[in-house]
């Protein structure tokens, strides 16, 4: 490898020891010092390639040990240096990135710089999703090889650069070249030490039916940590966080985002150290994790997507929307127009037959809806949620025939047809469980936990995945199914495989996720024209890993339009609006009992993939006309909402309305939506900012036909001259005047 080498976005200098990764608007710099410690120097606004190691201030901190190479220099300590790969047990007492237990029982991981390689394409991760190259943009990759000081263990650090999107990715691979086995007890996707700023962390917490509530707290010396040990990314915390400077807002301030491309246990943490440096980390959660690596075996972390914005949260979100939409989402529906669907779940729950389903479909077709989705209850002896999971055979008595017959009737109406599955689960009251009780996770000698009265299938087993693949593909092919909703309705515990060696039990949570990814990959390969929508009790697995397989995910089981404002607001910080499964449902709402105007429910659902969750035969004629108008609006604004730039116009502070805006990429039009969330006496007017219009173009506002320059709208905003009652909404369009 030459000492001086560069590809456009990756700059290497100083005899191959200084690495500067350049995107359109940001820079990331590392330096391998004379002791071969890889130091993190900078991540922020775009700079040149000058060596910034002079930013590091070394002093004797006291009780901070010194590596032997430092000699008498007490100022040089791993406990105080800003590192890229902090290891355990060798003098850095902050949270480490990697922990290894060696054959002699010791814990030590001291990795030093060895070499580097540059690739003119993005990197892949075996068995896991990752950003991929397209014809429009290829990533570039820097691979830094680190060797452990006292053992034959190699660590490869992967840095991917997507220049146009201002994205840098991180991942790592551990290779055991030694003669003895090791136990890998922790290995994160990245660690980064940020030297001098004060940060706040924005993270997204919640619970089932109330996911991704945005919260913001300062990063202090007490660690800020979120994560999941539920076997999924979970409803409770999302694997995406933001570090921003104090006071940063939508249009100002420095922001660093981190989004994990993974659907299992994870951790994300930030903490100030004794020098007020902030250590920022993300990866697989170390709880219940232990990977046994024999000689020649390797372990790969999931990918973390990093992005920087120097101009606030809006730009950061738009960068994530673009990278996920273009380099994570795949398949036939990556850009193809998604059908407007109706799902029967809230209309019927388990109480349906062919006649009921056809009546719902007939009315939906008359109103312009394009696909019917048959939810839970069509298979096995599934009359409630206590039985039948795993028996993926059509209940022909309930359905009055085969699924192919029902699908043909739906297709003859000119509609597409979709089905619900929950492949990863099994009911004890099922033929599958009676035949294969060992296929379920259960610890010998213990009664397993039940959730929704179901158990979790051992997705690490090839025979389990083969059975599921055969059942799913057979049904999809036989009935010419157009869409599948893939659900997962419980957390994972009692993890024990009846075929894995006991020494490998610490690998099962991760191997479970790999098994799910493997099944999804093979299923989509067998059904390449299928639209797959992810779901886990709504938004319990709403993450970039799942979006690699399902370009839209049911955002929440909560369909209440007012609650959805918060859920969809939090989702928008990282995930494209095109990934948000959002439906109009009945009122009073089944989750909250709230009554919300039909128009408002439609306006909120338009900020997503859009559909209905009701029996349209039971709504009024006036509401049916509203359905027609909403369907027409979805077609009218589809490209704008699914491909345009998204702006949050209201923020984390409490207000009596919520507003958001879509702007076409060519800035020719914009759609602004306002929902009144609270009513008061002597009502004050609603005034909102407008964003993203071209400064020197003229735009006509649909409210009053007023024409103003884009810069005027952007700065002066918009005042409603009509009073919105509680929960009422309005759509406002801005159109370029040519």
Label for each model-derived stretch:
Residues 12, 17-28, 37-271, 287, ...:
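Polysaccharide-binding surfaces and accessory modules of carbohydrate-active proteins
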Residues 25, 172, 296, 342, ...:
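Conserved, mostly hydrophobic/aromatic
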Residues 77-122, 250-264, 307-332, 369-376, ...:
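Glycine-rich, aromatic-flanked loop segments that form ligand/cofactor-binding clefts
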Residues 107-113, 291-310, 727-735:
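Short Pro-Gly-centered flexible turn/kink motifs
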Residues 250, 651-694:
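Carbohydrate-binding surface patches
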Residues 333-470, 483:
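Aromatic-lined carbohydrate-binding/catalytic grooves of carbohydrate-active enzymes
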Residues 400-402, 436, 440-597, 609, ...:
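Active-site neighborhood of glycoside hydrolase catalytic domains
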Residues 678-738:
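C-terminal beta-sandwich/jelly-roll accessory domains of carbohydrate-active enzymes
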């Amino acid at each position: 490898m030459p000492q001086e080498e560069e590809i456009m976005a990756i700059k290497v200098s100083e005899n191959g020891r200084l690495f500067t990764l350049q995107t359109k608007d940001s820079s990331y710099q590392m330096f391998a010092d004379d002791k071969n410690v890889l130091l993190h120097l900078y991540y922020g606004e775009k700079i040149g390639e000058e060596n910034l190691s002079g930013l590091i201030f070394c002093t004797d901190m006291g009780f901070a040990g010194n590596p032997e190479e430092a000699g008498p220099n007490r100022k040089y300590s791993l406990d105080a240096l800003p590192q890229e790969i902090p290891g355990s047990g060798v003098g850095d007492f902050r949270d480490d990135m990697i922990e290894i237990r060696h054959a002699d029982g010791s814990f030590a991981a001291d990795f030093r710089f060895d070499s580097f390689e540059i690739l003119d394409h993005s990197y892949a991760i075996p068995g896991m999703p990752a950003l991929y190259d397209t014809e429009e943009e290829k990533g570039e990759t820097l691979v830094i090889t680190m060797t452990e000081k006292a053992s034959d263990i190699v660590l490869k650090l992967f840095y991917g650069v997507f220049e146009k999107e201002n994205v840098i990715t991180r991942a790592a691979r551990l290779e055991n070249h030694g003669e003895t086995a090791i136990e890998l007890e922790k290995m994160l996707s990245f660690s980064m030490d940020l030297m001098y700023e004060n940060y706040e962390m924005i993270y997204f917490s919640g619970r089932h039916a109330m996911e991704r509530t945005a919260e913001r707290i300062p990063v202090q010396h007490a660690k800020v940590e979120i994560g999941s040990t539920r076997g999924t990314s979970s409803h409770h915390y999302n694997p995406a966080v933001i570090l921003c400077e104090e006071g940063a807002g939508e249009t100002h301030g420095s922001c660093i985002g981190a989004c994990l491309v993974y659907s299992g246990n994870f951790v994300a943490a930030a903490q100030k150290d004794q020098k007020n440096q902030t250590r920022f980390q993300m990866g697989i959660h170390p709880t219940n994790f232990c990977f046994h690596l024999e000689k020649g075996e390797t372990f790969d972390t999931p990918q973390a997507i990093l992005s920087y914005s120097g101009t606030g949260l809006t730009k950061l979100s738009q960068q994530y929307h673009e990278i996920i939409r273009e380099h994570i989402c795949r398949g036939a529906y990556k850009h193809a127009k998604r059908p407007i669907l109706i799902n029967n779940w809230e209309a019927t729950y388990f109480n349906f037959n062919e006649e009921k389903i056809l009546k719902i479909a007939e009315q939906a077709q008359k109103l312009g809806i394009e696909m019917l989705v048959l939810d839970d209850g069509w298979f096995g002896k599934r009359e409630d949620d206590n039985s039948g999971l795993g028996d993926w055979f059509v209940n022909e008595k309930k359905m009055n025939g085969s699924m192919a017959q029902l699908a043909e009737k739906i297709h003859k109406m000119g509609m597409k047809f979709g089905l619900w599955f929950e492949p990863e689960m099994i009911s004890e009251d099922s033929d599958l469980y009676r035949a294969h009780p060992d296929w379920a996770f259960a610890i010998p000698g213990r009664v397993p936990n039940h959730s929704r009265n179901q158990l979790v299938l051992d997705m690490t087993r090839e025979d389990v995945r083969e059975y599921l693949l055969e059942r799913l593909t057979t049904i999809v092919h036989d009935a010419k199914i157009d869409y599948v909703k893939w659900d997962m309705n419980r957390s994972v515990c009692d993890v024990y495989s009846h075929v894995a060696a006991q020494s490998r039990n610490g690998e099962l949570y991760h191997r479970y996720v790999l098994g799910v990814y493997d099944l999804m990959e093979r299923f989509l390969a067998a059904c390449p024209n299928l639209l797959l929508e992810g779901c886990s009790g709504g938004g319990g697995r709403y993450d970039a890993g799942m979006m690699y397989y399902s370009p839209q995910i049911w955002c929440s089981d909560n369909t209440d339009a007012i609650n959805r404002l918060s859920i969809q607001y939090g989702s928008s910080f990282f995930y494209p609006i095109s990934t948000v499964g959002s439906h109009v449902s009945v009122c009073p709402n089944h989750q909250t009992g709230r009554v919300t105007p039909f128009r408002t429910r439609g306006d909120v659902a338009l900020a997503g993939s859009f559909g209905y969750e009701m029996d349209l035969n039971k709504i009024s004629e006036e509401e049916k006309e509203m359905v027609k108008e909403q369907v027409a609006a979805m077609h009218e604004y589809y490209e704008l909402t699914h491909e345009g730039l998204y702006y949050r116009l209201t923020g984390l502070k409490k207000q009596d309305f919520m507003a958001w805006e879509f702007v076409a990429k060519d800035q020719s039009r914009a759609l602004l939506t306002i929902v009144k969330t609270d009513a008061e006496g002597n009502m004050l007017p609603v005034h909102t900012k407008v964003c993203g219009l071209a400064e020197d173009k003229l735009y006509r506002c649909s409210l009053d036909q007023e024409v103003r320059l884009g810069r005027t709208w952007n700065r002066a905003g918009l005042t409603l001259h009509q009073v919105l009652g509680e929960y009422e909404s309005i759509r406002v369009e801005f159109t370029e005047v040519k």
